[in-house]
Amino acid sequence: KRLLKDLSIEINQVIPEGGSVENLRQLPKAWFNLVPYREVGLMTAKYLEKEFGMSYISITPMGVVDIANCIRQMEERINIMSPILLNRRVNYEPYINEQTRFI
């Protein structure tokens, strides 16, 4: 959650955390799904992709390389929707560079 907060990405739902029927109805409002642990949410993400056309990212954001790859995937997904809905694009490379500068 901290990574998404750092990137100013609003979280729609975290499932199964707080998984009420009302919360589950909100799932299709997300621009994409992040599946940080394939063992837990991959089947749900595949279902949402099939039923609602929602893309998903299934990179586990652990370690410098995978965190950077995950952020770049999120940037790509956001930049597909953001210019249409918010009339702007995001660039997370400065964040990646700042986080990995001394590694």
Swiss-Prot record:
Subunit field text: Protochlorophyllide reductase is composed of three subunits; ChlL, ChlN and ChlB. Forms a heterotetramer of two ChlB and two ChlN subunits.
Pathway: Porphyrin-containing compound metabolism; chlorophyll biosynthesis (light-independent)
Chief localisation class: plastid
GO biological process: light-independent chlorophyll biosynthetic process; photosynthesis
Database matches in InterPro entries: ChlB/BchB/BchZ (IPR050152), Nase/OxRdtase_comp1 (IPR000510)
Pfam families xrefs: Oxidored_nitro (PF00148)
Cofactor (UniProt): [4Fe-4S] cluster
Catalyzed chemical reaction(s): chlorophyllide a + oxidized 2[4Fe-4S]-[ferredoxin] + 2 ADP + 2 phosphate = protochlorophyllide a + reduced 2[4Fe-4S]-[ferredoxin] + 2 ATP + 2 H2O
Functional note: Component of the dark-operative protochlorophyllide reductase (DPOR) that uses Mg-ATP and reduced ferredoxin to reduce ring D of protochlorophyllide (Pchlide) to form chlorophyllide a (Chlide). This reaction is light-independent. The NB-protein (ChlN-ChlB) is the catalytic component of the complex.
Gene for this chain: chlB
Entry's Gene Ontology molecular function annotations: 4 iron, 4 sulfur cluster binding; ATP binding; metal ion binding; oxidoreductase activity
Gene3D superfamilies: Nitrogenase molybdenum iron protein domain
Protein's cellular compartments: Plastid, Chloroplast
Keyword Iron: yes
Cofactor notes: Binds 1 [4Fe-4S] cluster per heterodimer. The cluster is bound at the heterodimer interface by residues from both subunits.
Protein name from the UniProt record: Light-independent protochlorophyllide reductase subunit B
GO CC terms in record: chloroplast
Documented EC number(s): 1.3.7.7
Family (UniProt): Belongs to the ChlB/BchB/BchZ family.
Keywords, in A-Z order: 4Fe-4S, ATP-binding, Chlorophyll biosynthesis, Chloroplast, Iron, Iron-sulfur, Metal-binding, Nucleotide-binding, Oxidoreductase, Photosynthesis, Plastid
